[in-house]
Amino acid sequence: MTELDKDTFDQAVLAHKGVYLVDFWSETCETCAAMMPEIETLERELAGEHALAGKVAFGKVNLQGNRRLAIREKVMSLPTVVVYRDGEKVKAFSKEFTASEVKAAVEGLLGG
């Protein structure tokens, strides 16, 4: 999963053609720490599914030092996972959600 910050986000995510999943998190967020392995597993699962391999990119933004970016992207609670398609936000998951819900949304966008 690519580490993103205020200097790399626009080029990596907003200029990306296709689906990009971004995990907004913080070191002080216990729920974020619990969810991170599930999102990393989801990344491996989607990379391993032949039909979806290479069709979705993954990144994460630590809010430490990136609060303005989070505010700009309307991330108001943690953890938050945002799904972008062709640089546009299409779906956001906040606080209580499962990796399965995120996977279903990504597969829906990819027709998988």
Task: Annotate the PLM regions.
Residues T2-V19:
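A short beta-strand-turn-helix
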Residues K17, W25-T28, S77:
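Short pre-active-site segment immediately N-terminal to redox-active cysteine/selenocysteine motifs
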Residues C29-C32, V81:
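The canonical Cys-X-X-Cys-His
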Residues T31-G48:
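Typically the conserved alpha-helix immediately C-terminal to a functionally engaged Cys/Sec
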Residues V61-A70:
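Structural microenvironment flanking redox-active thiols in thiol-disulfide oxidoreductases
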Residues R72-M76:
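A short glycine-leucine-enriched loop at secondary-structure breakpoints
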Residues S77, V82-G112:
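Non-catalytic, surface beta->alpha helical segment in thiol-disulfide oxidoreductase systems
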